[in-house]
Each structure stands twice: as C-alpha cells, then as structure tokens.
UniProtKB/Swiss-Prot annotation:
GO terms for cellular component: cytoplasm
Entry EC no(s): 2.1.3.3
Localization of this protein: Cytoplasm
Signal sequence segment: none
Protein name, UniProt field: Ornithine carbamoyltransferase, catabolic
Reaction equations catalysed: carbamoyl phosphate + L-ornithine = L-citrulline + phosphate + H(+)
Keyword Transferase: yes
The UniProt record lists the keyword Acetylation: no
Gene name of the record: arcB
Function in brief: Reversibly catalyzes the transfer of the carbamoyl group from carbamoyl phosphate (CP) to the N(epsilon) atom of ornithine (ORN) to produce L-citrulline.
Amino acid sequence: MPINLKGRSLDSALNFTTAQINYLIDLAIDLNAVNTKLHIQNRPLAGKNIVLLFQKDSTRTRCAFEVAAFDLGMGCTYIGPSGSNFGKKESIEDTAKVLGSMYDGIEFRGFKQSDVDALVKYSGVPVWNGLTDAEHPTQMLADYMTIKELKGDLKGRKIVFAGDIKNNVARSLMIGAAFVGMDIVLVGPKAQHELVQNGAGYKEVFEQCQALFQLNGGSVSFSTDKLQAAKNADVIYTDVWLSLGEDFSLFEERIQELGQFQVDMAMIKAAKSDVIFLHCLPAFHDDHTSFSLEIKQKLGKKYPVVKTGAMEVTDTVFQSKHNMAFIQAENRLHTIKAVILATLGY
C-alpha cells in the first residue's frame, strides 16, 4: 500500500509506523540523488509558505529548513528566540491559530514537547519538531539516512552512543534503531541506565522501543565500558555534554560524570575497521570555540580529559577518515525536504 503522509505532523517519531519512517529515509535518499535537478527544474510546492519558530538557535536546522523550502518552491519565514511573544505575552494556542491561518506548515525548535503538541492541536497545519528536550526526530532521520547511504542495509548493524545517554539525541537514536532493526548500545553512567529504562518521562518511550525491537529486530543494551561496547560496532556516535540552554557552570559536573566516555581513537580501534563516527554537531573537539577554550583554560589542568579543549570527542577522531559528521549534517537538508514534501505535497 502506498505511503500517504499528507497532512501529518512530525511531532514525535513514535507516532509513525515502521514503514512510514523507512519511507521517509528512502525518500530523502532519492531526493539527494536528484538534488541538482530539483534546484533548477522543479518547484513542487510553489505557492505554499512555511514558518520556522525557534526558541533555540541552530545552524543546521535553520539552514536545512530554509534551503529545503526554497528548493521546493515555498516561501519561508524565520522567527527567532526574540521574534515573537510565543508563550510569553501570547498563549501558545493563540499563536498556533494565527500561524496556522497564514502558513501551510510550522517548524518548531524549542524546549517543551508539550509546545509541539499544542501547535499540532491548534494550528490546523502540519507541524515539524525541529528539536525539543524530549526528542529530535529530524536529526534521527538524517542519522539513519547517513548510515544507510554509507553502510547499506541497516538491519543487524550495530551503533554505539557514548556520553549523555539520557538526552534527546540519544533517545531519538534509540527510537530510530528500533524502527530500522539495528542493535544500539548506550554507553554512559550507570545511574543513567536506570533512568532511561524506568525514569519518569523515559519508561514509556523505552517500552515503546522494546515493542518495536520485537517487531523489527535489533536491540538496546547498556554499558559503562566504552571499549567493550565498541567491539564490532559499525557506527560510533556522541553528542555534547551540555545542551543548548543549560548553564555553563554545569560543565565541571558533566566532565566528572561523562569524561570517561569521551570518544577517542582507542574506542575507534576497538570497533570494526570501517567504523564511521557521527555527531549531530556542533562538536567540542578542539579549543577553537570560546566555550572549549574556556574549558581548557579553567579545567584542563584539573581534568586531563579536556586539557586540549576537546570534550565529547578528541580532535584525532574528528579529523580522521572515520568522521562522517559533515555528510550527516548535509543529510539534514535531504531528510527535512523529504518530511516537508511528504506531509505537504504527496
């Protein structure tokens, strides 16, 4: 049966079926293959308009949505963190109704999953989750598109996520693994293992993923030993130790908690020889940002793991042939284009 997602919102990936998620990944691969022609010959969504509502800034998410919109022939409005009264002087419900009356689709990137849910409920148009504290579904689609392009069939592949396994990227990666039938190992602090499986706001998601693994194959497991976990891995993935919006003062605590899970060449060498490294970016892999330089200067002597300014991944890994994070970043464009086209056009 043909997949029809017209009018749907990408609020949570868990509201989709296995067939629908894999369809979006394959559609993105197809769109990438015809990307040049699409630029100059085809504007399938000409006359439509979308709005990007950002509470959190982002390079990749904003650029991917804007370029996707232009490629598809649409108008696109960006509203940044200070550009609206969303949830402050105007209720989310009222904002949703206003935007829904003017636009054909709404992208939201912010904090609360409940804000996405409210936009879906009251806007009357497709809403796309560009990131919340709970989930990052457009990133997940790009992650598995990248793996499929580089590795072929996803079923039975092994992916290892090392670091803050309770965050939205790790959660979305687990959800994606359950949809595509991959084995995922979450490598992080022991206390987070219990949280991800049974914590408030986590348990239901974990149980839904377990049901999907039963259906599609694959598995989720946990480890505190990054080298053991990396054995036979096809993919090693990490993310920043401190998310956008969290206070800088938390860095020392995170270094203490997560430093042992830094992705280094020992971990890469423990994996398959053709292992790929992925990161949703931005990455702290050297001292070339103000944040990482400050960490190096203030904490590098106390904590040797960050003495170069690198945090979640060493610069040696990031500069190696294994790093596919920039292909992954480009694939944000193709997967977002697939989501827009599927929900507005097909």
